[in-house]
């Protein structure tokens, strides 16, 4: 597999304002429940990482299983039916949902133990995300599973659509893999709007590592009228 150099735009222009695309902030004013949720998710990620590259013996794994079963029993009474604060149709989406929705998002939420640790920023009219993948996301030896690569494109492309306030449900997502996405190296995702139509937005993006093009993607997002 070849590894062509990235021909696309480089880092953001000097002086260009940068802000988070989604309402996910850190700091001393973070609500106590959110801080505790993130701490619990971080601990859960460590457990998942240990289980996806196991080196422990049966006795240790039995002890871990018993501890996790006890913790699951503690959390069980507090489960909700959905991560959304209020029920809504499956086809309903908002460009700027409640921050709690982003907090528990399966692809970027810091309180979701399976979400890759991606940080998505607004750089002008582009969405730029950086993420380092660990063993939890390994597919081929030393590389990220292609399904995870595609999932990250889904969230970075719709983040670009959010900047232009044309976010919607994913209609199509096409990914072209140019090189393996390595583990334990910073991966940069970029996306921008190419065209906006009556009810759809066409968005494209790329991922790179140290200037090497890893994959490219195009997506069509369908805007759904708010109820």
Regions found by a protein language model. Give the residues of each.
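HotDog/MaoC-like acyl-thioester-processing domains
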Residues: 2-96, 181-183, 194-227
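Active-site helix/loop of acyl-thioester processing domains in fatty-acid/polyketide metabolism
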Residues: 9, 122-126, 144-167
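Hydrophobic beta-strand-centered segment that forms part of the acyl-chain substrate-binding groove
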Residues: 21-28, 156-188
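Catalytic strand-loop segment that frames the active site of acyl-thioester-processing enzymes
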Residues: 32-47, 107-143
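Eukaryote-specific, low-hydrophobicity, charge-rich regions
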Residues: 72-126, 130
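Alpha-helix N-cap/helix-initiation motif
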Residues: 141-142, 146, 180
């Amino acid at each position: 597999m070849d590894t062509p150099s990235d021909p696309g735009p480089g880092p953001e222009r000097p002086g260009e304002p940068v802000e988070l695309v989604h309402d996910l902030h850190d700091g001393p004013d973070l609500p106590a429940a959110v801080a505790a949720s993130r701490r619990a998710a971080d601990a859960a990620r460590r457990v998942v990482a240990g289980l996806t590259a196991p080196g422990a013996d049966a006795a240790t794994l039995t002890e871990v299983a018993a501890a996790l079963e006890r913790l699951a029993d503690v959390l069980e009474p507090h489960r909700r039916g959905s991560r959304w604060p209020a029920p809504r149709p499956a086809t309903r989406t908002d460009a700027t949902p409640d921050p709690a929705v982003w907090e528990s998002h399966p692809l970027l939420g810091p309180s979701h133990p399976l979400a890759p640790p991606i940080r998505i920023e607004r750089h002008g009219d582009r969405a730029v995300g950086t993420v380092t993948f660990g063993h939890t996301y390994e597919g081929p030896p030393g590389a990220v599973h292609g399904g995870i690569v595609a999932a990250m494109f889904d969230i970075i492309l719709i983040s670009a659509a959010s900047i232009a306030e044309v976010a919607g449900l994913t209609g199509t997502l096409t990914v072209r893999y140019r090189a393996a996405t390595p583990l334990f190296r910073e991966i940069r995702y970029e996306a921008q709007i190419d065209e906006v139509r009556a009810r759809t937005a066409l968005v494209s993006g790329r991922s790179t590592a140290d200037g090497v093009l890893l994959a490219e993607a195009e997506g069509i997002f369908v805007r759904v009228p708010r109820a």
